[in-house]
Amino acid sequence: MNEYREYDEGLKRLSEIVEKLEDRELSLEENIKLYEEGMKLHKRLSSILKEQEGKMTLIKDNKEEDFQINMLLSDDNE
């Protein structure tokens, strides 16, 4: 599954879990199961975000490096 889609679906599910936990109509056992699912989901979503942040940092660093190289090259041509 595509990470973007996985993230969106995971976020939606996490929101559903929070709503159910706030409802207070569930048994303790059901609350614990939902809490465990929510924590696992939170961990996975955080991991996806960190991966994407890393990719964005690489892109940003490469763009800055390209910009600096282009600036140096344009200075040499003047």
Swiss-Prot record:
Species of the source: Finegoldia magna (strain ATCC 29328 / DSM 20472 / WAL 2508)
Keyword field: Cytoplasm, Exonuclease, Hydrolase, Nuclease
Pfam families referenced in this protein's UniProt entry, alphabetically: Exonuc_VII_S
Gene Ontology biological process: DNA catabolic process
GO cellular component: cytosol; exodeoxyribonuclease VII complex
Gene: xseB
Subunit (UniProt): Heterooligomer composed of large and small subunits.
Top-level enzyme category: hydrolase
Keyword field contains Repeat: no
Name of this chain's protein: Exodeoxyribonuclease 7 small subunit
